[in-house]
A protein has these predicted regions:
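Short amphipathic alpha-helical segments
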Residues: 73, 77, 88, 107-110, ...
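A short, conserved structural fragment
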Residues: 116-126
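Short secondary-structure transition/capping segments
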Residues: 1-5, 114, 136
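Minor-groove-contacting beta-hairpin "wing" of winged helix-turn-helix DNA-binding domains
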Residues: 127-131
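Short amphipathic alpha-helical interaction segments
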Residues: 100-117
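C-terminal scaffold of the Radical SAM
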Residues: 1-102, 156-162
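Short, amphipathic alpha-helical interaction segments positioned at domain boundaries
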Residues: 133-162
Length: 162
């Protein structure tokens, strides 16, 4: 079913993996469960005792939550397009998010150029296309757009220098 959905352009991805359903709210039930409602994520507490103690008080057993920023939503749409469809329309991202793609993602494009030289993808004026040789590495390609991974790499690089 997932293969058919990918071929038909109906494949989606969420934090749990691939799906044929787009943007579904996911409710978190159980210890350490993660839920998604709209542009927010919440994770439940991590121990069974704490989970039941909080429920017994009539509260939700949420440990932490985050609300996605406009940048998070932009990057999520790029990562999803690359991982689900193996291509990204630069123009559609610019229109949907009111950005100049090449300016906003100059650093990411520079990183992708090395992958392009390796035959994993192709970048032109309107598209980023994952080539057959890059499909098995699409996760690494998409990770270029993950701001949180980039900041972790920069922090690690800086701390190694010191």
């Amino acid at each position: 079913e997932l293969t058919t959905a990918q071929r038909q352009g109906r494949l989606h991805r969420n934090f749990q993996g691939y799906s044929t359903y787009a943007e579904c709210d996911l409710l978190a039930f159980g210890v350490s469960a993660i839920g998604k409602v709209g542009p927010t994520y919440a994770q439940n507490v991590k121990t069974l005792d704490e989970y039941y103690d909080i429920l017994d008080t009539g509260r939700l057993p949420v440990l932490r939550g985050i609300e996605l920023t406009p940048d998070d939503l932009l990057r999520r749409s790029i990562i999803q397009a690359l991982m689900c469809h193996f291509e990204l329309s630069i123009e559609s991202i610019e229109i949907a998010h009111l950005i100049d793609f090449k300016t906003y993602f100059a650093s990411e494009i520079a990183d992708l150029r090395d992958m392009e030289k390796g035959g994993l993808l192709q970048i032109d004026e309107q598209w980023i296309t994952v080539l057959p040789a890059g499909r098995m590495l699409v996760r690494a390609i998409a990770m270029v757009f993950d701001r949180y991974l980039r900041s972790d790499r920069e922090r690690t690089r800086y701390s190694k220098v010191i």
